[in-house]
């Protein structure tokens, strides 16, 4: 923010961070488009099945993934009343530093638990709520959302590849919701529109770097461990 000259350019705390996550969201769509496409198709098939009173057996993996994402998103609504207070913590370097250390510890420990086998077919609905709670807690500045949710998945016995995939797909409704809320503030005249070019640069860089990081993380997960 300091480099691009947009620090404090908005009365809405965290607006620039939200825009950066929008770039990462684009990267998620590109990296996981086959899975997301299947989920979209199954969403409409599910509506059709509901209208006709039918239920496929077994439930298609993509349809179950939709349910896991919905349940994993619910805990975010619990923290909405304190959203502004949490965003205000970004100015406290002690909080951010401690949160970064916690993220590192979570990733270190999670990489040393027994490798799990759960995927979208076998993960429990309660697992989705727990990972969703981890995502809600990761709204604290300094806590990595993806790192925290991936670690939570590993603790719950998720297959490493599924933990990564679920973490990033779970981010879609969260980031979309955050951007809708921030857009409302922007339309209210709280954004310095002269900084829009800097915002665009930030989003583009976040998209490119985000995609590269997702690809790298997928490759690392393929070997079954995140560490050496």
Map each language-model feature to its residues.
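Multi-pass membrane proteins that catalyze or facilitate reactions on polyprenyl-/lipid-phosphate substrates
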Residues: 1-228
């Amino acid at each position: 923010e300091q480099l691009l000259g947009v620090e404090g350019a908005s009365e809405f705390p965290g607006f620039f961070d939200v825009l950066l996550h929008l770039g990462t969201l684009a990267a998620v769509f590109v990296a996981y488009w086959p899975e997301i496409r299947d989920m979209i198709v199954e969403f409409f098939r599910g509506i059709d099945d509901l209208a006709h009173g039918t239920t496929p057996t077994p439930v298609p993996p993509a349809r179950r993934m939709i349910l896991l994402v919905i349940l994993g998103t619910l805990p975010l609504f619990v923290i909405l009343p304190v959203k502004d207070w949490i965003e205000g913590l970004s100015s406290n370097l002690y909080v951010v530093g401690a949160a970064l250390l916690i993220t590192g510890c979570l990733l270190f420990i999670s990489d040393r638990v027994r490798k799990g086998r759960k995927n979208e077919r076998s993960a429990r609905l309660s697992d989705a709520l727990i990972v969703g709670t981890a995502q809600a807690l990761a709204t604290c500045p300094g806590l990595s959302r993806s790192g925290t949710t991936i670690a939570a998945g590993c603790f719950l016995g998720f297959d490493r590849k599924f933990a990564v995939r679920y973490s990033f797909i779970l981010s879609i409704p969260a980031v979309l919701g955050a951007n809708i809320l921030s857009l409302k503030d922007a339309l209210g005249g709280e954004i310095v529109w002269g900084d829009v070019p800097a915002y665009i640069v930030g989003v583009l860089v976040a998209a490119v770097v985000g995609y590269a990081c997702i690809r790298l993380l997928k490759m690392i997960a393929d070997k079954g461990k995140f560490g050496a």
